[in-house]
Amino acid sequence: MVAWLVLLMVMIVGYDVMMRYLFHSGSVALQELEWHLFALIFLLGTPYTLKHDSHVRVDIFYKSQRVSDRQRAWIDLFGGLFLLVPFCLLIIISSIPFVTSSFIAGEGSPDPGGLPWRFLLKAVIPLGFSMLLLQGVADMLRCIFVLRQKKD
C-alpha cells in the first residue's frame, strides 16, 4: 500500500511542479496533499521497514561475521526494549490528546484553498506508532526465541 502512496505522491509532485513552472498556477491543496502523503508514507512505511529488517543501522558491526546470531538477538532485544518500546509509547500516549482535540475541532487546513479534514491525517500518528510497536514486540519475541535455543 505504501508503494502505491509513493507512486501517487510522485505523480502529484510532478503535476504540481509542471503546473507551477509551466503555467504559473500553484495549488495550496496539492502541496498539502504532498505533505499528507509523505506523512502517511512515513507513518505506515516504518513498521513495514522494521518487519523486513531494512532500517539503517551500523552494519559494519552488526552484520560482520564476528557477531553471532545470539549477539544480534541481544542487540535487537535491548534496542527494542529500551529504545523502540518507550519511544512508541511516548508518541502514542502524547498524540492521543492532540488527535482528540483535532477531531473535536474538526480541524482542517488554516490556509485558504487548503485541504479539510486534517484530523484524519493526525489520527494516523497513533495508528502508525501502534503498528510499529506491535512489530517491535513481534521482533523482540523472535529475539527471545533465538536466545532460548540451545547453543550449537
Which ranges hold each PLM region?
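Alpha-helical transmembrane segments and membrane-interface helix-loop junctions
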Residues: 1-152
